[in-house]
From Swiss-Prot:
Bias (Low complexity) ranges: 215-233, 247-259, 564-592, 644-661, 691-701
Basic and acidic residues composition-biased segments: 103-117, 234-244, 629-638
GO BP of this protein: positive regulation of transcription by RNA polymerase II
Function statement: Transcription factor that controls the expression of genes related to the process of conidiation and adherence and regulates biofilm formation. Controls conidiation and adhesion primarily by affecting the expression of the three regulatory genes flbB, stuA and medA. Required for virulence in an egg and a mouse infection model.
Cellular localization per UniProt: Nucleus
GO annotations of cellular component type: nucleus
Gene that this sequence comes from: somA
Composition-biased stretches (Polar residues): 75-84, 453-467, 607-624
Disordered, as annotated region: 75-122, 212-295, 424-726, 764-784
Entry protein name: Transcriptional activator somA
Record's subunit section: Interacts with ptaB.
Phenotypic effect of disruption: Impairs conidiophore formation.
Taxonomic source organism: Aspergillus fumigatus (strain ATCC MYA-4609 / CBS 101355 / FGSC A1100 / Af293) (Neosartorya fumigata)
Length: 784
């Protein structure tokens, strides 16, 4: 036990206790700091006054009167005489100054005789006696020191006070040991800054009680101290970083400068740091800079608990680096506590997202809000099931994420991962947008796995469809073609592909969610776990159809396989990207032209009759008979002629078995066509003048040896496009053609088809042509 505690806190039994107020210096002599209250006569008068105040507040009036009458006892009192209430001495606004003293807690006034003066004390506002309060505290401390008290609060207070006293004493002793070195230390350092080093500095160091050290050891100490000083001077400039402070680990090697910038250690000026009498180098104590131990203690760190190597490295750092080290340590400590708290709650490894492996990628919430699914290439599991992470499917040690902080941190992590992924996709898309030979990129985006295709993982149309149309016709129509001009289409943001990968089920009405939109031939039309594209960035479809298991053999199928009907027969060729299924809310005549204004006599009779087979002779048509002579807005023959010209051109270029209904009618004289939406060549059935919504289309990509596929009669419950009021939502059927041959639209030239020059190929677009609104599918008013 040190001298302070021996003299002050632990006296012998019955010994004096007067050393407690003077525990800072361990001396029992009275302190003379110039304060008048420290004069013994004044202290005696104050004690007498407090005793008098105690008698008054306890009701001992006779004892108080005896103190007043005794002339040998001096008291600090006020004059007992009082004037009128408005002119009392030291009263404000006529209010008594001793109102608090005369009133007790219960409202009853303490009756103080008028002949007794009021005590003049600084603590007059207290209701209880100061002497009584002081004695109560003193008694607790007194008996707690002698281990006879039963108060736990007093024990804790005494233990805390003694610990703080010990730490202060140790710090004070260390400062006293370092004090003789500081004046000699600062002089050489200041001269070194000015470029001057005294010649006798080394001699002074050798003569400074270093008999136990050899010259080699002293030289090594000088080199080490010089290196540390240079590192400190280099690190002191880190405060001028424009990007702010970057926290570093206290034990990290990044604090040291690079080897190329390290100063030469040989033949350099000797460090001005002096050696202590015991031969040890002291810390770099600069004037105005806090000591390393004092800095650690100010931040609540105990230097004794640190590793000696860590503490030595901390002392060698500059003031700015020391502040950074303490800041980083506090941050790491807070992070450690937060992870420990999360581990105590059952979350493994301090993860923010329970039930998710540490190496798992983005998680997107399900539409029902009950789970998450990953945004990576393993969107479909090995058994074809959607890789969902439901709330109930968690790790054994997991816990439901119902904490606000945990949810917020998980959202931040997801947002950061999604931003990084989108940035990578945008860069890959710009790099692989087009090739030098004009061919479109492969449907996998070179350099990217199938699960990270930039175009396949986005829903909605491209910001500029006209530029993407010039890239060429890709084999997979869903990888970058423009959307439908129909702005009212409910599936407008999923124009990329007819497949259910980009199908937004959240916008689909409930009555259209039947099995007719998801075919039985799902294993033949979809790839396996690695053969399908990832979901869009905002998928909303989580219907039961996607939960169907996909056979493993479907991985080797053609990834651009077509959808099949429920009956199993293949549909016609794939429609153009502009021709997409309509929404049930706003049926429009999008995929067909209206009947001619003056149809032939037998045209109406052929509408209700079943469609003829492909091998039957074509129905006589009025389109090729009249020769166009002038531009008439209602010349329907020219409209039908211009529709067949791109159809015949594309069909002749893509298929080996063109039906006779197309080959028998050569194109007429090239004339400017009416503005129409780009249609697929097989959008109109040549076997009938008026196709219905589910009219099967002719196969144009079938090989020559295969027989022509027969088409079943149309459903009689379906209505024609002439009737715009379709009450039955089941009348629509997403009939998609069979793309067994991926070369359907390979050679179709969209640039020639959409060319606005009327003199080049005969497919020009003349904006001066006017036409009625009832025959234009994009009409939105009286005229365009």
């Amino acid at each position: 036990m040190n001298q302070m505690n021996v003299t002050g806190m632990n006296p012998g039994a019955g010994g004096p206790v007067g050393g407690v107020p003077m525990m800072n210096n361990g001396s029992t002599a009275p302190r003379n700091d110039g304060n008048v209250n420290n004069i013994p006569e004044t202290m005696i008068n104050n004690l007498n006054t407090y005793i008098y105040d105690y008698f008054l507040k306890r009701g001992y009036h006779e004892c108080a009167r005896a103190l007043v009458k005794d002339e040998s006892i001096k008291l600090n009192t006020e004059p007992p005489t009082k004037t009128s209430p408005g002119h009392r001495r030291e009263d404000m606004n006529g209010v008594e100054g001793d109102a608090i003293m005369t009133d007790s807690k219960d409202g009853d006034k303490i009756k103080i005789p008028d002949d007794l003066p009021r005590p003049n004390l600084a603590s007059e506002s207290q209701q209880s006696s100061f002497l009584l309060d002081w004695f109560s505290l003193f008694w607790d401390f007194f008996w707690a020191q002698r281990k006879k008290g039963n108060s736990n609060d007093v024990r804790q207070y005494l233990q805390h006070t003694q610990n703080m006293m010990r730490l202060r004493e140790q710090q004070h002793n260390q400062l006293l040991r370092q004090q003789p070195v500081m004046p000699r230390q600062m002089g050489p350092l200041n001269m070194r800054r000015n470029g001057m080093v005294p010649a006798n500095l080394q001699k002074t160091v050798l003569q400074n009680n270093t008999g136990g050290l050899s010259q080699q050891q002293i030289a090594q100490l000088q080199k080490n101290q010089q290196m540390h000083m240079m590192q400190q001077m280099q690190r002191e400039h880190s405060d001028m970083d424009m990007n702010g402070h970057r926290p570093q680990s206290p034990s990290s090697a990044e604090n040291a400068p690079s080897p190329s910038k390290r100063p030469r250690l040989e033949n350099g000026p000797m460090n001005g740091q002096q050696l202590a009498p015991n031969g040890r180098g002291q810390g770099q104590a600069m004037p105005g800079q806090p000591n390393s131990q004092a800095l650690l203690m100010q931040n609540g760190l105990n230097p004794r608990a640190m590793n000696p190597a860590q503490f030595a490295g901390f002392q060698q750092q500059g003031p700015a680096a020391q502040q950074k080290s303490i800041q980083v340590y506090a941050q790491n400590l807070a992070l450690h506590h937060s992870r420990s708290a999360l581990n105590n709650q059952g979350i493994p490894n301090g993860l923010m997202n329970p039930g998710v492996m540490p190496n798992q990628t983005d998680l997107v919430p399900m539409p029902d809000g009950q789970g998450m699914y990953p945004m990576n290439g393993d969107y479909y599991g090995t058994n074809g099931q959607m890789a969902q992470v439901r709330a109930g499917m968690q790790t054994p040690g997991g816990q439901h994420g119902n904490h606000a902080l945990q949810d917020y941190q998980m959202q931040l992590m997801l947002l950061e991962q999604q931003n990084k992924r989108r940035l990578m996709m945008a860069r890959q898309e710009q790099d692989s947008m087009s090739r030098a030979d004009g061919q479109p990129p492969m449907p996998g985006q070179q350099g990217l796995p199938p699960g990270t295709s930039p175009q396949g993982s986005r829903a909605g149309t491209s910001p500029n469809p006209n530029e993407q149309m010039k890239r060429g016709t890709p084999k997979m129509p869903q990888t970058g073609l423009p959307g439908s001009p129909n702005a009212a289409d409910a599936m407008g943001q999923n124009r990329g592909s007819p497949a259910a990968m980009n199908f937004n089920g959240g916008q689909m009405p409930p009555d259209m969610a039947g099995g007719q939109f998801f075919m039985k031939g799902m294993p033949d039309a979809m790839g396996g776990p690695n053969g399908m594209r990832p979901p869009s960035s905002n998928p909303a479809f989580s219907g039961p159809q996607m939960g169907q298991p996909i056979p493993a053999g479907a991985v080797n199928r053609v990834p651009s396989g077509n959808w099949q009907q429920q009956q199993g027969q293949p549909m016609g060729p794939q429609q153009s990207p502009a021709q997409q299924p309509q929404s049930t809310g706003t049926p429009q005549t999008q995929n067909s032209m209206p009947p001619p204004q003056a149809p032939p006599a037998g045209a109406n009779a052929a509408r209700t009759s079943p469609q003829s087979q492909n091998a039957a002779p074509p129905t006589p048509q009025q389109a090729n008979k009249p020769a166009p002579k002038k531009r008439e807005p209602k010349d329907t023959a020219r409209k039908r002629t211009t529709k067949k010209q791109p159809a015949a051109a594309a069909a002749a270029a893509n298929t080996a078995a063109t039906p006779s209904s197309e080959a028998e009618h050569p194109p007429t004289t090239p004339t400017p066509s009416t503005p129409i939406t780009p249609q697929h060549p097989s959008s109109f059935n040549k076997a009938g003048p008026n196709p219905t919504t589910s009219a099967p289309q002719q196969p144009t990509s079938a090989p020559a040896p295969q027989p022509i596929v027969q088409q079943p009669p149309p459903d009689q419950t379906q209505q024609s496009f002439n009737d715009l009021s379709i009450p039955d939502a089941s009348a629509f059927n997403l009939d998609f053609s069979a793309l067994e041959n991926p070369d359907i639209l390979e050679n179709f030239d969209f640039d020639t088809f959409l060319n606005t020059d009327a003199d080049t190929a005969g497919f020009g677009f003349d904006p001066n042509i006017s036409y009625p609104t009832d025959g234009v599918e994009t009409g939105a008013g009286d005229g365009l």
